[in-house]
Structure formats: C-alpha cells, structure tokens
Amino acid sequence: MLTAEDKKLIQQAWEKAASHQEEFGAEALTRMFTTYPQTKTYFPHFDLSPGSDQVRGHGKKVLGALGNAVKNVDNLSQAMSELSNLHAYNLRVDPVNFKLLSQCIQVVLAAHLGKDYTPEVHAAFDKFLSAVSAVLAEKYR
C-alpha cells in the first residue's frame, strides 16, 4: 500500500519525467527488448530497432498510461481497467512482462533523474509500479 509520502514522492518525480514520455518510454521499451528478448513476441508487426517511430509511439503510450496512473493513484483499478482488459483478453500478454517493463522503467528514471531519484523515490516507485502491474494482471484471474 502506498503511503501519503510515497504518493508525494511519485508525483514529484513524475513531474520531472512527464515532459519526456516519448523519449523515456522508447528507452524503457528498447531496454526491455534487449534485456528480455522474449518480450519482442508481442510486437510482431513493429520495427523494434531503437528509436523507430513505432517504438517511440508505443513508448509514449506506455508512459502516458503511467502518467494517468500517477494522476489516479488512489483508484488504479478504475483508471487502468481498459488497459487491463486489452492486455488480458485481446493481447494476452503474460503478466510477468509488466514486471519486466517496470524494472526497465525504473532504470530509465534513475538514469535520467539522477540525484533526484533518491532511494526513497526508488522505493516509492517500486511499490507504485508493483501496484500498477497487479492492477493490469487483475483480469487474468
């Protein structure tokens, strides 16, 4: 469960990252495809080369959805319901992949936010991304 302090730290960090959604999202996806190549199977029609328009576009969507989750942190289930349905019923993404992408997002945030990505911010974002992953996996049960 996220504390009030966690929510504050998440909001503050997100304010610094929000204007870089396409860049950070593409970097996180590229990192995921490189580190966990099995994740590429969900994108058979994408040009998965780093910086491709499709990777940048999807990265922007992913981080845009994450921004929506930040805004609706107290009601993640409702805010992420449509995405949960899409990934569970249409795309049939294995929920473990949400955790893999979460790890890559953490690395990208740490790399770009530098000293602002304190251990406390890291811990708060870890809890937040775990909550988002759990909500995205809700429809699988």
Curated annotation (Swiss-Prot):
Annotated GO MF terms: haptoglobin binding; heme binding; iron ion binding; organic acid binding; oxygen binding; oxygen carrier activity; peroxidase activity
Keyword Transmembrane (UniProt): no
Tissue distribution of the protein: Red blood cells.
Domain Globin residues, every copy: 1-141
Keyword Transport: yes
Pfam families hit by this protein: Globin
InterPro entries, A to Z: Globin, Globin-like_sf, Globin/Proto, Hemoglobin_a-typ, Hemoglobin_oxygen_transport, Hemoglobin_pi
Gene Ontology CC terms: blood microparticle; haptoglobin-hemoglobin complex; hemoglobin complex
Keyword entries, A-Z: Heme, Iron, Metal-binding, Oxygen transport, Transport
SUPFAM superfamilies associated with the record: Globin-like
GO annotation terms (biological process): hydrogen peroxide catabolic process
PROSITE patterns attached to this UniProt entry: GLOBIN
Binding residue positions for heme b: 58, 87
Function of the molecule: Involved in oxygen transport from the lung to the various peripheral tissues.
Subunit structure: Heterotetramer of two alpha-D chains and two beta chains.
UniProt similarity note: Belongs to the globin family.
Identification of the protein by name: Hemoglobin subunit alpha-D
Species of the source: Meleagris gallopavo
